[in-house]
């Protein structure tokens, strides 16, 4: 495993839409392991592939209950509203209030290629939606409620 360089705000890769992962192979598994190591080293709760310069539809989250890997994720449903401060490893030191759904239902593949669905609320829902945004070139500062 290796630490990857986290791309910072201003890097054009953070504004690009990611492509679907076509196959789960040894290179992708290595990328996932590297992303986990990088996220934990930076004290993050999530990291998306474009944040390490890879334009693939892949992100990881861990809010303290163990890591979750999302490959080619889809958002199936959202509900409710919550406003809370968000930060991002690509914008170190910056936080802003962001309104997000309080509930999300998502479908993705895990690192073994197995499809799963997850229902999440509060912090986990926020983390999933934040990382999902990265796959479409959206940053949390685009969604801030601060004027």
Curated annotation (Swiss-Prot):
Catalytic activity: N-terminal N-formyl-L-methionyl-[peptide] + H2O = N-terminal L-methionyl-[peptide] + formate
SUPFAM superfamilies: Peptide deformylase (SSF56420)
Gene3D superfamilies given in the database record: Peptide deformylase (3.90.45.10)
Residues the entry annotates as binding Fe cation: 88, 130, 134
Assigned protein family: Belongs to the polypeptide deformylase family.
Physiological role: Removes the formyl group from the N-terminal Met of newly synthesized proteins. Requires at least a dipeptide for an efficient rate of reaction. N-terminal L-methionine is a prerequisite for activity but the enzyme has broad specificity at other positions.
The name this protein goes by in its record: Peptide deformylase
Organism: Clostridium botulinum (strain Alaska E43 / Type E3)
């Amino acid at each position: 495993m290796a630490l990857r360089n986290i791309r910072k705000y201003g890097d054009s890769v953070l504004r690009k839409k990611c492509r679907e992962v076509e196959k789960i192979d040894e290179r992708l598994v290595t990328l996932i392991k590297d992303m986990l190591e990088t996220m934990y080293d930076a004290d993050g709760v999530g990291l998306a592939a474009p944040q390490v310069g890879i334009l693939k539809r892949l992100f990881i989250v861990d809010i303290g209950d163990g890591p979750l890997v999302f490959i080619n994720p889809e958002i199936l449903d959202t509900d409710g509203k919550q406003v809370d401060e968000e930060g991002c490893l690509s914008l170190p030191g910056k936080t802003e209030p962001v309104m997000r759904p309080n509930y999300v239902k998502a479908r993705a593949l895990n690192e073994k290629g197995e499809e799963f669905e997850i229902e999440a609320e509060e912090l986990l829902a926020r983390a999933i939606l934040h990382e999902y945004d990265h796959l479409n070139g959206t940053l949390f500062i685009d969604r801030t409620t601060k004027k």
